[in-house]
Amino acid sequence: MGQGDATLIKCDGHSMLIDAGNNDKGTLVQNYLQHQGVETLDYVIGTHPDADHIGGMDVVLYKFDCKTIIMPDVANNTRTYDDVVQTMKNKGYKTTYPVVGETYTIGGAAFTIIAPNKEYGNDMNSWSVGVLLQNGNHRFLFTGDAEEGAEQDILQNGIDISADVYKVAHHGSNTATSQAFLDAVHPTYAVISAGEGNSYGHPHAEVLNRLRAAGVSVFRTDEQGTIVAASDGTTLTWNMSPSESWQA
């Protein structure tokens, strides 16, 4: 996937996609979904209108039957965003805006919207849709590129965000995963999606050290490629062992 985000969630024959990678990754995401047997996406969430999250979304929206498309109520003055809007129009899709506290079902699992909690002007990252997914005893937290200010707003909305698995915000940037937020999530596992040798230096050492100090097991796409977690509601298994190098 490189320096971008895409997460596929499958449960009881239902599928959900959170983000779709960068502009040049749409076909890669499409091929992965098809390889996984996906024909219909019950939910597509574009966390925020930055290219590394919605770049491939026009391809996904065009190629798959998409039921509910959730994106924040903010526009971005970019060709990438325009491509998504145009594809939505061409397919007759409507945007569902996220409402904090609303819960949706996906098979036997469910997810709750936890962000955005207010309007953030032109700060696209802070508009990120946050989702807490629950399958049986397992909880997974996804916050897009939400940064520290948006994390504070999540902490103040009263929703319990403790989770077994935390998809680390903003590719492991030190502008996110504040100590207070990490303490509230208290994850056992963390997944960092970042491009190998990316120019941003993601994930940042401060975040890795914060996770290490909290005893969290970390998985990294820049070192390990596609990471798969399987939950039956009681047992959680992974397609590989946690990264070792992050402990440097």
Listing of model-derived features with the role each one plays in the protein:
Residues 1-248:
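Non-globular, low-confidence helical/coil segments that flank catalytic cores
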